[in-house]
Amino acid sequence: MDLWQLLLTLAVVGSSNAFVGREAVTVTLNRANLSLQRVNASLETNSSGNPKFTKCRSPELETFSCHWTDEGHHGLKSTGFIQMFYTKRNSQEQNQEWKECPDYVSAGENSCYFNSSYTSIWKPYCVKLTSNGGKVDEKCFYVEEIVQPDPPTGLNWTLMNTSATAIYGDIQVRWKPPRSADVKKGWIMLDYELQIKQTNETQWKMMDPVTSTSVPLYSLRLDKEYEVRIRSRLQNSDKYGEFSEILYITLPQSSPFTCEEEFQFPWFLIMIFGIFGLTVMLLVVMFSKQQRIKMLILPPVPVPKIKGVDPDLLKEGKLEEVNTILAIHDNSKPQFYNDDSWVEFIELDIDDSDEKIEGSDTDRLLSSDHQKSLNILGAKDGDSGRTSCYEPDILEADFNANDGTSEDVQPDKLKEEADLLCLDEKNQNNSPCDAPPDPQQALVIPPEEEKPQPLLIGKTESTNQDAPNQISNPISLANMDFYAQVSDITPAGSVVLSPGQKNKAGLSQCEAHPEANFVKDNACFFKGDAKNPDVMTPHIEVKSHEEPSFKQEDPYITTESLTTAAEKSGPPEQSPSSEMALPDYTSIHIVQSPQGLILNAAALPLPDKEFLSSCGYVSTDQLNKIML
């Protein structure tokens, strides 16, 4: 029948004289489309030939109904062709009995209704469709899983307040639960979802589900019209029921004029202009402070230079000035080695006088016949001999100031200094022994005249008091010690040397028997007070024989002193029982302690070597010639 209607409609559309105008053609096409849809549905149903369940629904958790499709038997009121059976599954019953639908009419066509007498919760149901005794579809479910409440009813809204600009308003929407749901007694608990949109919009805005029957809506435009709809679901379920009827909301305007669009502050433009202004200011600051910013971002690399040295001197090549500047700094001074030609100075640390009161070697040496007070000129040099060596004039002035002697002694000193400068010729002509000294007996004083005096620096004994002891003890020279090492410093600041090898046998003397007259101001020594160097006035004793003398003003051993001493001492005949004479010591070997020094023995002069008659300090070449 439907097919014949479709063919008739197409025939009518094909005739151009039947309808006039575009509207008539549109209506005809719509009718033809509906007819084709019906024919297609009939063809699909008839082609499959099997009815199916469409849905099973419980509106209030007390009753439920199931619906199915049967287009092939449309219009037939007899139920003999399609039947629905149900059963309640029970794990204890193995053979379950299927029962036919209790009501085919109450829920509508092609449906089965189960009232409260046939409905049980917490139990599974299974339903099936049969056609002419054969099963065509089957479905199992729980009643609480198919709950889809009816739509809420009684929707209305209330205006709560409006904004000060009369542009926005707040409302509250209320509704009632579904009539079929027993919400008051608590048999069922529902959640409600509200959806809202403007009238001219197509997209609904969903609100969060609530359990109450009222929802506030804020900031609604007063010049707009809104649509609201609500649906419900069982709590903890995801199946919503049908939507309620649409509620139309039109907010009243407070002024007779049409509400215009709200004035929006131009934040975007302000941000653009602000960024532009900040950029301009930053560029201005960068250009004005370009050098300083460059120094902060890229600090300059420091130029390599020597502290205290002007780099212009290095560029100009003035090496003499650079060397002078480097010599001022201690860390730039060259180190002295043993083979260096520079003079090495000895620095002695003087201990407290309280630490040397008892048990010192000085008391032992000064208590016996070995006590010989040379009354040597003493002065403590605070710079370890630098001033006395390089500035002899200053030291002589200090000695004269501290000496306390009269100015009558100065001509004698100058005369002796002149004699010391050129002693080579005098000593060669006036030497009591013309033969060159024996290497083993050089620089040895005859034992009969005077015993060798230890280099003991004292300050109280005089030459007049020691003269009887020197004459009365002529044999003690053989047993006297040479002192080669500093062993102690007395509380008064005097230096005591340690004894060396003894000469046990007596030494023969020259025929002239010269007596070595040592001037007592030919050595520097340190007193107890390091700040006030004292100078002892020498007492020169006139001897009958010509004696080698040392320079009085110079506190250090010079070439002339060594040369004169070597030439004046004759080659005495060695006793058979005597030992080899000890040489003088000229250099430091080991520093054992701040007060202990071991000196290296210098080689005795050979017979064929001649001493240089140079004036001044001992140079390296002269010292090597003396030591050979």
UniProtKB/Swiss-Prot annotation:
Per the Swiss-Prot or TrEMBL annotation, the motif WSXWS motif is positioned at: 240-244
Q: Name all Fibronectin type-III domain ranges.
A: 151-254
Q: Which residues lie on this side of the membrane: Cytoplasmic?
A: 288-628
Q: Which residues carry this modification: Phosphotyrosine?
A: Y483, Y585
Q: Can you list the disulfide-bonded cysteine pairs?
A: C56-C66, C101-C112, C126-C140
List the subcellular locations: Cell membrane
Where does the motif Box 1 motif lie? 297-305
Gene3D superfamilies recorded for this chain? Answer: Immunoglobulins (2.60.40.10)
Q: Which PROSITE patterns match?
A: FN3, HEMATOPO_REC_L_F1
Q: Which residues are glycosylated?
A: N33, N40, N46, N115, N156, N161, N200
Describe its PTM? Answer: The soluble form (GHBP) is produced by phorbol ester-promoted proteolytic cleavage at the cell surface (shedding) by ADAM17/TACE. Shedding is inhibited by growth hormone (GH) binding to the receptor probably due to a conformational change in GHR rendering the receptor inaccessible to ADAM17. On GH binding, phosphorylated on tyrosine residues in the cytoplasmic domain by JAK2.
Main location per the UniProt record: membrane
Chain intervals for the UniProt region annotation (Required for JAK2 binding): 294-379
Motif span (UbE motif)? 340-349
Q: How does it assemble?
A: On growth hormone (GH) binding, forms homodimers and binds JAK2 via a box 1-containing domain.
Entry similarity comment = Belongs to the type I cytokine receptor family. Type 1 subfamily.
What does the further note read? Guinea-pig is completely unresponsive to endogenous or exogenous growth hormone. It is not clear whether the aberrant behavior of its GH-GHR system can be attributed to a defect in post-receptor signaling.
Query: What is the recorded name of this protein?
Result: Growth hormone receptor
Protein's organism? Cavia porcellus (Guinea pig)
Q: Which gene encodes it?
A: GHR
